[in-house]
């Protein structure tokens, strides 16, 4: 999914669900948004090398000119889900995320994502990927543990 942070709100306005691998995803992003600085928020496991790959997913994204914002390790699932819920509707009843109607896969994922009895996302249902991607973005940009918390603070190096 593609979005921007504006006035401390997250606006999701596009999604890419048809890319068959990370290289195809990077090319699609570059073709749709050739003039924009792109920040990516992948799953931290994207830095792991598989036995049949010469590059990790994060290396591919970084090599395509995107700024990697993934943490060294993924946040706890419950914390990430709570971060998404807080942006959807906080304690004051305010929503700080808007998802454009064209983002059908993300909306479907948000509506149909289920969880196991242990509280983990049900990976068998097939609805976890887009919801997870939204969670990683929100965790990184709006989590009060990070200095940014939805506000630009200049250059950050990790």
PLM regions: where:
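Mg2+-dependent endonuclease catalytic cores in nucleic-acid-processing enzymes, primarily RNase H-like
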Residues: 6-122, 144-145, 155-158
């Amino acid at each position: 999914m593609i979005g921007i942070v504006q006035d401390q709100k997250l606006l999701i306005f596009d999604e890419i669900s048809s890319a068959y691998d990370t290289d195809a995803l990077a090319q699609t992003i570059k073709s749709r948004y050739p003039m924009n600085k792109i920040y990516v928020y992948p799953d931290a496991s994207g830095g792991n090398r598989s036995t049949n790959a010469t590059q990790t997913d994060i290396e591919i994204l970084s090599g395509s000119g995107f700024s990697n914002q993934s943490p060294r390790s993924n946040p706890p699932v419950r914390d990430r889900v709570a971060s998404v819920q807080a942006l959807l509707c906080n304690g004051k009843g305010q929503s700080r995320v808007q998802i454009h109607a064209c983002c059908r896969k993300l909306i479907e994922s948000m509506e149909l994502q289920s969880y196991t009895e242990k509280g983990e996302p049900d990976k068998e249902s097939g609805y976890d990927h887009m919801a997870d991607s939204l969670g990683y973005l929100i965790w990184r940009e709006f989590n009060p543990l990070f200095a940014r918390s939805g506000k630009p603070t200049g250059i950050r190096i990790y």
